[in-house]
Amino acid sequence: MSEQTINNKETRGFQSEVKQLLHLMIHSLYSNKEIFLRELISNASDASDKLRFKALSNGDLYEGNADLGVKISFNVEANTLTISDNGIGMGREDVIEHLGTIAKSGTADFFSKLSEDQSKDSQLIGQFGVGFYSAFIVADAVTVRTRVAGAAKDQAVQWHSEGEGDYTIEDVTKESRGTDIILHMRDEGKEFLSEWRLKEVIGKYSDHIGIPVSIWTVEKDEEGKETEGKWEQVNKAQALWTRNKSEIEDAEYQEFYKHVSHDFADPLTWSHNKVEGKNDYTSLLYIPAKAPFDMMNRDHKSGLKLYVQRVFVMDDAEQFMPSYLRFVKGLIDSNDLALNVSREILQDNKVTQSLRGACTKRVLSMLEKIAKKDNDKYLSFWKEFGQVLKEGLAEDFANKDKIAGLLRFASTNKDSSEQAISLASYVERMKEDQDKIFYLTSDSYAAAKNSPHLEQFKSKGIEVVLMYDRIDEWLMSYLTEFDGKQFQSITKAGLDLSKFENEAEKEKQKETTEEFKSVVERTKAYLGDRVKEVRTTFKLATTPAVVVTDDFEMGTQMAKLLEAAGQAAPEVKYIFEINPEHALIKQMADEADEEAFGRWVEMLLGQAMLAERGSLDDPSQFLSAMNQLLSK
């Protein structure tokens, strides 16, 4: 086979993140080095899928050979292992893009999280996905020769690197289409220059690949001399999702997940279903155990692999899964879509919408099943994906109740920041006369659990849901009730707990309110339009004053969320509530001098605003008032 260098050779530097990845991978993934073969075979399989799809509209791309497969050979004397495919191949720009850079958003942030702890780094790198670069775990140099299907033989490209700071790329001739990856093995990688070792790894990781994976085997005669070799197919070469569920082992499902997701860890769970009827399709859906590093990034690629009648059509078909389930991996194989379907056609396609609805219900059912049978397992899911699942309340009205049932929060029922309380369990513990689900949103768990707004609830033994994720205030604008019970924010002015008080308490409060009427009026006169209203409150115990908002006015946390997103937030007008039974309020009430009275108001309002917002518009005014009061 005459393959030779032509010209146009250049040396290029790796993107800085590639250099960092290569270094970390070699040192962090060494204990799991055999995964390099899984990654390279998986890439070869993808290249074959893409050729098969493109050849549907241009059969000439097969160049007279439609038998797709992966071939693996080794040379002990030359110390090389070669993985070859006859798939779609790559052009010069493809090679630079795919082998010289990492085209993922948030890459720099990902690398900043890496440490020198090999076990932790290997888990993080597994979430990132390494693909081709895993070759450097076992090789100290890698050569790639590739030609795009349909291109002239002298339009092939050779890429070479020793895994350091740069690589070379040049034009070469290549007789066959597709890609050859030649690994120049390290001493530690020589164990893979063995027929039995290669068969072992392929059987373990790549049995499910839908195209043949073959090894060049050399037989020996009776005298021990090598005879002419032959290609021996090692894997089953049957697409896993087309097989009967009862014939598939859990280990096979787990390895297939790693093929479609490029994750290193086993999935949390999966669901394999063949559906016949109005729509004929097969789905294989996986829920990962760990979130990918860039899941919250807007440019994060998500979606399922789409096959039509077992022919690969596209990766990342996001039309079959709503955004709030973007962590789901897997595939869908439809008999009802056309092979030439495009992303634009999928968007408004009735079949697509039907499959999307079915897949969504399937995933939510999987989650309900885990939550019911294995609480610890579900909480591990929630820790990874809970914030994303919450988005579903705004996106998916049809499944709103199911999503609400899957939510988990902290609450005053448990002295822990762990979000482990379901709304159903809260409702079960509600007091006899309680008809609302009480909740509090805050910046953090510490701020929530120490909020003065909780004092009355603690004294009455009423449980409050504690919410401290950034999106929770926004979330509650879509979650208004659960199981027939309305939600009630405990920082809103409309809060009424009178049903939990006896008549004597109510009468005493009425008398005290009347006594403090003049104090309320003086306070309002001093503050003017800085607050919406001043009034007494009896919901506090150890706190002198708080601020609350009207029921239909934007809350503090929502205003903070908008500001953090760079959006203009309307000014929040607070209601200032004072506790007439607190010593400081009584001291303020006894102050006859209006100037001194004003200092008391400034200090107490400042304290209330700090407790609510964590900041003040004018700290100097608060500090001046406090210093003067302390120096008396």
From Swiss-Prot:
Residue ranges of region C? Answer: 561-632
Recite the UniProt keywords alphabetically. Answer: ATP-binding, Chaperone, Cytoplasm, Nucleotide-binding, Stress response
* Signal peptide extent: none
User: What GO molecular function annotation could you give as one example from this UniProt entry?
Assistant: ATP-dependent protein folding chaperone
Cellular-component GO terms for this entry: cytoplasm
Annotated region B: the residues are 344-560
Q: Where in the cell is it found?
A: Cytoplasm
Q: Where is this region: A?
A: 1-343
Superkingdom as given in the UniProt entry: Bacteria
Any one Pfam family here would be: HATPase_c_3
Tell me if Transmembrane helix is a UniProt keyword of this record. Answer: no
Predominant subcellular localization, coarse grouping:
cytoplasm
User: Sorted alphabetically, which InterPro entries does this protein's record hold?
Assistant: HATPase_C_sf, Heat_shock_protein_90_CS, HSP90_C, Hsp90_fam, Hsp90_N, Ribosomal_Su5_D2-typ_SF
PANTHER family reported in the protein's UniProt record: HEAT SHOCK PROTEIN 90 FAMILY MEMBER
According to its UniProt entry, what is the function of this protein?
Answer: Molecular chaperone. Has ATPase activity.
Subunit structure, as described in the record:
Homodimer.
Fetch the HAMAP family from UniProt.
HSP90 (MF_00505)
The record's similarity note reads: Belongs to the heat shock protein 90 family.
Please identify the protein, giving its name as recorded.
Answer: Chaperone protein HtpG
Lineage per the UniProt record: Bacteria, Pseudomonadati, Pseudomonadota, Gammaproteobacteria, Vibrionales
